[in-house]
């Protein structure tokens, strides 16, 4: 069977630190359920469409040609948006506060959930 490049980044809650230390990135599948994932995806699109609504060619989730306009949001490294207060978008807060996500970070940092602090700097997507 062919191995995809991303498969080496797959981790579980117990070995995520090893994968992060090795590759600098980790994927923990199946943390969010389908409803949570759909809400996240809608949140991303709602935010991008709102931010660009007054542009000559606004981003539209249903128009793949409009996706080229994302470059005008000035993503760093072709994926990281750090402007327009995007780090405070509601869908990002929903992800940050999801107990399943909090548990992963508390386990990673070996601390209590309530001892975690969050960052507000950016949104990353592929």
Annotate each predicted stretch with a short phrase.
Residues 1-22, 29-126:
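Non-heme Fe(II)-dependent double-stranded beta-helix
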């Amino acid at each position: 069977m062919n191995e995809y490049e991303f498969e080496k980044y797959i981790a579980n809650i117990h070995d995520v630190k090893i994968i992060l230390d090795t590759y600098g990135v980790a994927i923990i599948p199946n943390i969010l359920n389908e409803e949570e994932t759909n809400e996240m995806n809608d949140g991303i699109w709602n935010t991008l469409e709102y931010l660009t609504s007054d542009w000559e060619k606004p981003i539209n989730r249903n128009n793949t040609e409009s996706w080229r306009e994302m470059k005008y949001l000035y993503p760093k490294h072709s994926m990281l948006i750090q402007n327009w207060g995007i780090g405070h978008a509601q869908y990002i807060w929903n992800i940050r506060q999801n107990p399943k996500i909090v548990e992963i970070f508390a386990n990673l940092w070996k601390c209590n959930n309530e001892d975690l602090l969050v960052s507000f700097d950016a949104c990353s997507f592929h």
